[in-house]
Design a protein with these regions (language model features):
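N-terminal small/glycine-rich loop or linker at the start of catalytic domains
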Residues: 1-12, 70-83, 116-123, 158
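Histidine-acidic metal/acid-base catalytic patches
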Residues: 1-32, 99-102, 108-110, 148, ...
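Active-site-proximal loop/turn and secondary-structure-junction residues that shape catalytic pockets
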Residues: 14-16, 40-42, 72-75, 116-120, ...
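N-terminal substrate-binding region of glycoside hydrolase catalytic domains
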Residues: 25-49, 70, 74
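Conserved beta-strand positions in the central sheet of alpha/beta enzyme cores
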Residues: 37, 68-70, 113, 154, ...
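Glycine-rich, proline-tolerant flexible connector loops at the mouths of alpha/beta enzymes
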Residues: 37-60, 116-122, 127, 162, ...
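Glycine-rich, aromatic-flanked loop segments that form ligand/cofactor-binding clefts
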Residues: 59-71, 103
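Active-site acidic/histidine proton-transfer and metal-coordination neighborhood
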Residues: 61, 81-193
Length: 274
């Protein structure tokens, strides 16, 4: 499925939620898509062998690519947005890194998203510094593990309007983090920007300028309209010119559909904009 030469994949953690998780890749294929992506689909940092096998088999049997997989994100319903920088979750994240890399290797996934995590106490400067130091240590571990399976690690700015305690809320902050980690290990070339157009637009960033400025550092793109995080065409974001710009810049990756469908009981209705 292509528009302006772009390939679209379905985030099956937010779309097709009317179906059991393992049925979603096949539903995406039936809707005409060749790729899927997921947030970390288990509560535990290391899934059991049967769970991992079933997940990988569902994707393979559907005949779709696993485009992107998140490292463990924590309890999203409770407001968590990643464990990368969370001191109490240090052991959980580090247990998750090899597990995530192994699934990526088995499924042929080449993009692993590492959500930064919320500030534990934004008013505590010492704790904030501790979190940032931990994030760099964990990103070094994650990037090295990903490199071993020929995958990139994605850094995603998440808007601080919806998630006020999330510190990496702009493209500039994400790139600064990438550069900091690269300075620690100059051999690491697999840290990339995840350009989520919804989050960037919610932060009032100039999307065309961001796509141009960081063209060679974008590892993945995601899309939802603004406001509301619905399907393209439900808000005010001029998305088609951005797609044309990405194609003109030579972007060869996937663009993930990561929006909330108007009818959660029938995701396929949300694809009429394509």
């Amino acid at each position: 499925m292509r528009t302006h030469g772009l390939r679209f994949d379905v985030n099956c953690s937010i779309l097709f939620t009317e179906l059991p998780l393992l049925e979603r890749p096949a539903a995406a294929k039936a809707a005409g898509f060749g790729g899927v992506e997921f947030w970390w689909p288990w509560d535990d940092p290391v899934p059991g062998d049967r769970a991992a096998d079933a997940f990988i088999t569902a994707i393979a049997d559907a005949g779709v690519d696993l485009v992107s997989l998140n490292f463990i994100t924590g309890d999203i319903a409770a407001g968590e947005r990643g464990l990368l920088s969370v001191p109490k979750a240090k052991d959980a994240f580090r247990a998750n890194v090899p597990a995530c890399a192994e699934i990526a290797a088995r499924a042929g996934c080449t993009r692993l998203n590492a959500p930064y995590g919320n500030r534990v106490d934004p008013a505590d400067a010492r704790l904030t510094a501790e979190q940032d130091e931990l994030a760099i240590e964990n990103l070094l571990l994650a990037a090295r593990a990903a490199a071993a399976v020929e995958a990139d690690v994605l850094i995603e700015p998440i808007n601080s309007v919806d998630v006020p305690s999330y510190p990496i809320d702009t493209s500039a902050k994400a790139i600064a983090l990438i550069n900091t980690v690269r300075a620690e290990d100059t051999a690491l070339g697999n840290l990339k920007l995840l350009a989520d157009l919804y989050h960037l637009a919610t932060m009032s960033e100039d999307l065309s300028a961001v796509l141009a400025r960081y063209a060679d550092q974008i590892g993945h793109v995601q899309v939802a309209d603004v406001p509301g995080r619905g399907a393209p065409g439900t808000g005010t974001l001029a998305i088609e010119p951005l797609f044309r710009q990405l194609a003109a810049q030579g972007y060869a990756g996937w663009t993930g559909l990561e929006y909330v469908p108007a009818d959660p009981a029938d995701t396929t209705k949300s694809f009429t904009w394509l």
